[in-house]
């Protein structure tokens, strides 16, 4: 029997079967996809083959994961070689950002975008809490949005409290399975409650000591839109503190920054790292202001990760 994983509680997975029934299943201990060392071998959005519970008391279990069309993955922790898969078989991903309380840095945004580029997942940047922004915050919002829209990433300015911008965002999600990600405290749960009122997700407050969010979502789950086209759904995920990248070779990183990749076609050397080489078209574009400095800094940060990974000993 086949189905789609719609919830991951850590020990069990809720699977919606092709006949519409929903079953909690265990994952077999040897269930792994080739070439992926993951803390969660099964993720929400996975298409799976399951074996129903038997009459002798054996619980239902996931027998096989069907090949994934794509997925979003991050390093499980800074010192880990294992990964954590946020969601699979996605039509889009929404990264929820805030200018303040908490601050979403451009490095965090760019690491998420680069990973999504690597796995061919289109991203929409959603800047939430615009009802709370000062004039200075709004100027910063406009500057950031200009950088990302110029590259090709749609940017939505919304308020989960007032509803501003939500109709436009909702239209972008119609007919899509969309992953929702971001730091704790950016208002993901409030945003889902505003978009899908029946979701009734718990929301949390901001830690005033650290200006970071406190986790309210503790597991990933798929939530259907009742008023959009069939197949329209969000995958809600727990808040992420950092975004460590994986599986990017030193000479591949630039491929996942569209504007850097476009400029790199003019480089003198095919193995240019765009850091110091003579005849580097990327550095020239950076000097001319055609590549945002913040984006180049993010590129360097991922490049440093990959160089450090090469010299990390096996344990």
Swiss-Prot record:
Instruction: Spell out the Gene3D superfamilies in the cross-references.
Output: Nucleic acid-binding proteins, P-loop containing nucleotide triphosphate hydrolases, Probable gtpase engc, domain 3
Q: Which residues bind GTP?
A: 128-131, 182-190
Q: Where in the cell is it found?
A: Cytoplasm
Q: What is its EC number?
A: 3.6.1.-
* Binding sites annotated in the UniProt record for Zn(2+): 267, 272, 274, 280
Q: What class of enzyme is it?
A: hydrolase
Annotated GO biological process:
ribosomal small subunit biogenesis
Pfam families named in the record = RsgA_GTPase, RsgA_N
- Report the cofactor remark: Binds 1 zinc ion per subunit.
Lineage, top-rank taxon, reads: Bacteria
UniProt KW S-adenosyl-L-methionine keyword: no
Instruction: List the molecular function annotations (GO) for this entry.
Output: GTP binding; GTPase activity; metal ion binding; rRNA binding
The CP-type G domain is annotated at 79-243
Q: Which coenzyme or cofactor does it need?
A: Zn(2+)
Q: Which UniProt keywords apply?
A: Cytoplasm, GTP-binding, Hydrolase, Metal-binding, Nucleotide-binding, Ribosome biogenesis, RNA-binding, rRNA-binding, Zinc
Q: What's any one GO cellular component for it?
A: cytoplasm
User: What function does the entry list?
Assistant: One of several proteins that assist in the late maturation steps of the functional core of the 30S ribosomal subunit. Helps release RbfA from mature subunits. May play a role in the assembly of ribosomal proteins into the subunit. Circularly permuted GTPase that catalyzes slow GTP hydrolysis, GTPase activity is stimulated by the 30S ribosomal subunit.
How does the record describe its quaternary structure? Monomer. Associates with 30S ribosomal subunit, binds 16S rRNA.
Write out the similarity annotation: Belongs to the TRAFAC class YlqF/YawG GTPase family. RsgA subfamily.
The protein, known as: Small ribosomal subunit biogenesis GTPase RsgA
The top of its lineage is:
Bacteria, Pseudomonadati, Bacteroidota, Bacteroidia, Bacteroidales
């Amino acid at each position: 029997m086949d189905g789609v994983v719609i919830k991951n509680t850590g020990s069990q997975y809720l699977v919606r079967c092709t006949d519409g029934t929903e079953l909690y299943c265990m994952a077999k201990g040897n269930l792994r996809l080739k070439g992926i060392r993951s803390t969660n071998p099964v993720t929400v959005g996975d298409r799976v083959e399951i074996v129903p519970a038997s009459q002798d008391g054996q619980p239902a279990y996931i027998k096989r994961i069907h090949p994934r069309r794509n997925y979003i993955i991050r390093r499980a922790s800074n010192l880990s070689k294992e990964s954590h898969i946020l969601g699979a078989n996605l039509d889009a991903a929404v990264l929820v950002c805030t200018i303040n309380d908490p601050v979403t840095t451009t490095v965090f945004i760019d690491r998420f975008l680069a990973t999504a580029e690597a796995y061919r997942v289109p991203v929409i940047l959603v800047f939430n809490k615009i009802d709370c922004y000062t004039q200075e915050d709004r100027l910063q919002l406009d500057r950031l949005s200009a950088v990302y829209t110029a590259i090709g990433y749609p940017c939505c300015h919304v308020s989960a409290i007032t509803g501003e911008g939500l109709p436009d965002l909702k239209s972008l999600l119609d007919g899509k399975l969309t992953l929702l990600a971001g730091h704790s405290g950016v208002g993901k749960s409030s945003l889902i409650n505003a978009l899908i009122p029946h979701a009734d997700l718990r929301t949390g407050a901001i830690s005033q000591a650290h200006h970071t969010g406190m986790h309210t979502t503790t597991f990933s789950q798929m939530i259907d839109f009742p008023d959009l086209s069939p197949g329209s759904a969000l995958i809600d995920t727990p808040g992420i503190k950092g975004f460590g990248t994986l599986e990017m070779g030193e000479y591949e990183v630039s491929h996942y920054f569209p504007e850097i990749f476009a400029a790199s076609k003019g480089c003198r050397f095919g193995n240019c790292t765009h850091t110091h080489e003579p005849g580097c078209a990327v550095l020239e574009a950076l000097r001319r202001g055609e590549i945002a400095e913040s984006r180049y800094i993010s590129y360097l940060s991922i490049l440093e990760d990959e160089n450090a990974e090469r010299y990390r000993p096996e344990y």
